[in-house]
Structure formats: structure tokens, C-alpha cells
Amino acid sequence: MAREYKLEDYRNIGIMAHIDAGKTTTTERVLFHTGKIHKIGETHEGESQMDWMVQEQERGITITSAATTAYWGGKRLNIIDTPGHVDFTVEVERSLRVLDGAVAVLDAQSGVEPQTETVWRQATNYNVPRIVYVNKMDKAGANFKASTESLRKLLGANAHPIQLNIGEEAQFTGIIDLVEMKAYEFDGKPEENMKEIPIPAHLLDEATLMRSSLIESVADFDEEIMEALLEEKEVSIEKIKAAIRKATLSATYFPVVCGTSFKNKGVKLMLNAIVDYLPSPLDIPPMKAYKGEGEISIPASDDEFFSSLAFKVMNDPYVGNLTFFRVYSGILNKGTYLYNSTKGEKERIGRILLMHANSRTDIDEVRTGDIGAAVGLKFTTTGDTLIDEKHKDIVLENMNFPEPVISQALEPASKDASEKLSLALQRLAAEDPTFKYYTDEETGQTIIAGMGELHLDIIVDRLKREFKVAANVGAPQVSYRETITKSAEVEGIHKKQSGGKGQYGHVWIKYEPNPDKGFEFVDKIVGGKIPKEYIKSIEKGLKEKMEIGILAGYPLIDVKATLFDGSYHEVDSSELAYKIAASKSLTKGREMLGTVLLEPIMDVAVVIPEDFFGDVMGDISRRRGQVRDNETRNDGAHVIKAYIPLSEMFGYATELRSMTTGRGTYQMWFDHYEKLPRNLADEIIKKRGGKVKIDED
């Protein structure tokens, strides 16, 4: 089957923003104008096409990245609508990983908000070219210039308006296109009928000045424009557009447009900007991959072997397990086999679907640049490489996800629900790499862990609604970590020899702090002091012990372990004996290694009216918070940014509401781990005394 759209006519884009900036409403308008839907659903009425989960419709927020394909200006748009709530930044992270470009949506009244910074930082990490859409221009306090300035000031973004608004707030009636120097007026109807009008006389000088500034801003990216400016020659519209595109593709230059999606003004011009300035799969660097120890790149072409990355797994009530994947090269036909080179497993692709939020169309093939969904894959999870079987030694660059920072005990409401609960949690964990669950060995309780209170609320809600599992939930708990602060050489012996086949394992291991590098195991055994076949068991013993900790039952992190000596017994040595010996060595080293507890520190942004500034600052200080920044927003509100331990943040929403008479809001996300003060650490260790198991012979 021939390709319907050329690869250069693809736009794989994400729509990202702070919560409530109007991102889903904007996506709805895009779908309406591109003919994907024939009735507009409003987010605040719980009717949005892209917010398809019941929880999303009730809460008016986007939780999962819904994917859809639309068409505009002769181009094919694969659009992913991402959540703006910080508890769901993993959704943003994994969609940015597979997108080529993005639209950042700002609220014209607030400009850059705390979560804007988070998603902007994520997009910068992945080098994603962006355009900015300043939405809600009809809102009281809307200010296009101040919003653009907030991009420069708060994000350090090289942002340049390519439009000028005609009027603001209730008087926002139209837009001047600075590239073409044309003005448009909107009728505000869903069809967004635009009428070209003369540029209003009172805005002509400003528009001319802004256009000159725009042309100068792209001259650094285009020599011809630079020469034309030096020679004071006129620059053609085509050249300006080409230069803006080139600048945008560098991911260091950000065109800014404006509108009000809810009032149907400016969305079509934003669509034009997506088509004109955001990249096709051919405009971005080839996909990086690993072959053995070396690195290779895979060009975006149908003629290459098939390669793709699974970026989302979800359970669909009608078709079962769905795996979303982005195709980087080659062609895949349904009914064929692929190799999951991350897991080392073969997968059969029985059905391929093209998704629109939660509705689906069966298709026969996917090609380079496509985003598809496969049904019923058995082994594939988020971040896995799916590749042509002849190239099974190639793995695409993976995604890294943060570990959970908050946990809750969960008990099935009845005995019957127990088995269903286990299956449901298994499915939810397969969908979401930042959600984990395990059984507490001491109490036998099931523990669920995630990125925040809302994250776990949604999980519990989904258990009840989707899986029909009722469960009782305990109070949220902090997920502490343990680490070592000193180096030491520690012996570990496991010996049971009392007639018959005994057990014998003997190791010497040097432990060293390994900040931010996780667990590292080094084998320095020489002369066969410990046979090779037991080395893996020693590493496994250490890993298993690190999972349950050596101080207070929390995972031990950032340790380098070098196995340098030991001995063995020809008859009694076994894999199990060495595993236990390694575990004992680590427990024995608890004191000499200076083991400490670490607590998760959250990056918190509190938005309040000025009147409450003193009270809120005092409260942050009482919570062991360190204020790192304080600024005044476009609308006069204060934004206080601080690092605060997670343990001090439970119930903060209620207290902030009461402190600010309901006018304060906050957002927080995990930032780093820090050593817990000694007095608090002692309390926790004492409380969890029963959790620390000392290995005994």
C-alpha cells in the first residue's frame, strides 16, 4: 500500500501546559476544525473527546495522554494531549520522548505558571522544538505582551511573537499576522469564520515595529536575511517563514501566537503555525540506538528495517491490552512478528489500530512517522524497543522514570476481592511505570506507591470503577530511602556444616558511597578464589538485601560494591550460600558504613494574593522549607518556590485554603533526596524497629 502522506508532511506533536490553561479545550477545537469531530465537547461540562476516562470527565483534568490523528493544510497531524497536573508528569515525559514538536499553551492572565516550568524543562531535555499559544485572551487580566515576557524572564526562552492581538479581555476581537502583515477578525462561532480587515490604524506603528524586530530575531539563523537587513532590502514573506521554521527547528527559538480557544478565536492561525514551523520526522536528528557496546543512528525512512518504541501500555475494556508505539523506521504489516529487544522476547502483531482518544480503527500497516497501537502484546511495557527480528541486537534509547515518593496501605474490602485486587494492580502497574505495589512482609498488607496523593486517589478510583474492586485505604506514607556515607571492607560468611552436604559461602566486599549513580557491582576476584558461577548470586544477594534495606526497612540506594576476596568449599558451596553470605556482609556493615535515612524533598510552588505573603512564608519555614525563589506574576499574584520535605506536606491543601480564605493554590513535584535530620531519623528507626531483620545463622 502506497504512503498516503509524504514523510515531510507529517507533524507528530504534543499539546502541553499547566493545569487549567485550556489545553484540552484547544485540542477539541483543533479536532473540530480538522473535521475529526462534528460537535465540540466542553471540558468543564465533562464532554471532552480527548478526556475519555471517567475520572478525567469528573475532575476536568487530563490524566492519560490520548492520541489522535488529524489533517490540516495538506499535512497529517498526530496529536497527543498530555496532562498538566504534576502527579501525571510521567505521561508528559513519555509522550515528549516520541514527539517531534510541541505546542505549549499558556493562560494569558497568568503567563508562565509552575507546571509550565516543569513541562518546559522536560521538553528542553528531549530537545523538542516548540511554538507557544497564549490562550484565554478574552479573560479579565489577559496580557499577551506580559505572557511573552514571562517566557523570557522565567524560562529564559528566546520567545518572539509572530502575531499581535487586536484588543484584550472582552475586547479581544482579532489578530494581526506579523509575517504577512494581515489582520483578521473572528465571528466567535464554532466554525471560527475569519474575515480579513485592514490593520487598525492605532496598531499599525506597533505592528510594523514588531515585524522588524521579528525579522531581526531570525537573522541569526539565516544569512540571506542578515545580508538583506545590512543592505536595507525588503525580505519576502516566504524567506521570513523559512527562517522562522529553521530557527524553531533548532529548539532554541520559540514563535508565540495567541487566541481564545473557548471563544473560537485564533485556533486556525495556530494550526497554520504548527504546519509552517514545527518539524516533520525528517527534520529531527535520526533516532539513537545501541548495538552491542556501540551507538548507531537509524534514519527515518520506509526503506530501513522496522524499528519502534512502545511509549504507553493501557487496558482497553473492549480489546484488552493496548500498546502505543512510535515508528522510527520501516513498515509493519499486521499479522507479522516483531522482536522486543529490551526484554528478549518475540511478539506477534495480530491487530494494528489507529486511535482517536478511546475509539479505534483497524488498519493493515504502519510506516515511519506513524503512531499506532498494537493489541494483545504479552511482554512489552513502556520504553521497550519493538524491532525487525533480523535486527534483534539493536535497542533504542530508553526512557527513565522517577521512583514513587508516596505510599499507602491498601486492603481488599472482602476476601473475594483479594485475587481481583492482585490482577488489577498488575495491570495498572503495567500501564504506569511510576506506580508500584508490593506486599509488606511484616504486616502482610498490600502497599501502593506513586508520585502524589492525586495519583494514588485516581488509582484507587480506577480499581473501584474499572476493575470493580472495593478497597480500604490507609493514610499516605513517605517513601524514605537509605544510603551509606562511608567506605569499608566487610566480610560475609554463611556456613552450616554438620554432617552430610552443608552450606558454605565466604565473601569480602568493599562498599563505597555512589551518589546519584544507583547500585554498581564490580567483580575483582582473581585466581579463582570464588568460582565464576557464584558471582551472579553474590550480586543478586546484595540487590535483594538493598531492596529491603539495612537500617529501617527502606530501599538502600547509591552503593558501589566491589567483590575482592573470599573462599569456597568444593562440596558445600552453592549459589544460595553465596547469596546469603553477600546479604550478611551488607547487614554487618550497617554501622561502619555510616548508614543514614534519606527523605524525598519536593519542589513546591505556592500561588497566593499579596495579603497572605507573610503568613505563608512563616508556614513554609515551620515545615522545614527552604525558599528558593519569590516572584510576582502578570496578574499580581505572588509565586513562592521552596524545597519542602514531603513528610511536611500532607494535608497542606486544606491548611493553605484556610490560611488564604480559599484563594491560595499550590503544586509540588519530587526534586531530590536529602539526609533526614538525626532526631527525626531516630524516631522512624525506632517506630520501624521490627522491620529491620538482622541475618542470623
Curated annotation (Swiss-Prot):
Keywords: Cytoplasm, Elongation factor, GTP-binding, Nucleotide-binding, Protein biosynthesis. GO terms for molecular function: GTP binding; GTPase activity; translation elongation factor activity. Residues 8-282 form the tr-type G domain. SUPFAM superfamilies: EF-G C-terminal domain-like, P-loop containing nucleoside triphosphate hydrolases, Ribosomal protein S5 domain 2-like, Translation proteins. GTP binds at residues 17-24, 81-85, 135-138. It comes from the Bacteria. Signal peptide: none annotated. InterPro entries: EFG_II, EFG_III, EFG_III/V, EFG_IV, EFG_V, EFG_V-like, EFTu-like_2, G_TR_CS. It is found in: Cytoplasm. GO terms for cellular component: cytoplasm. GO terms for biological process: ribosome disassembly. Its main location: cytoplasm. Catalyzes the GTP-dependent ribosomal translocation step during translation elongation. During this step, the ribosome changes from the pre-translocational (PRE) to the post-translocational (POST) state as the newly formed A-site-bound peptidyl-tRNA and P-site-bound deacylated tRNA move to the P and E sites, respectively. Catalyzes the coordinated movement of the two tRNA molecules, the mRNA and conformational changes in the ribosome. HAMAP family: EF_G_EF_2_B (MF_00054_B). Belongs to the TRAFAC class translation factor GTPase superfamily. Classic translation factor GTPase family. EF-G/EF-2 subfamily. This is Elongation factor G. It comes from Metamycoplasma arthritidis (strain 158L3-1) (Mycoplasma arthritidis). The gene is fusA.
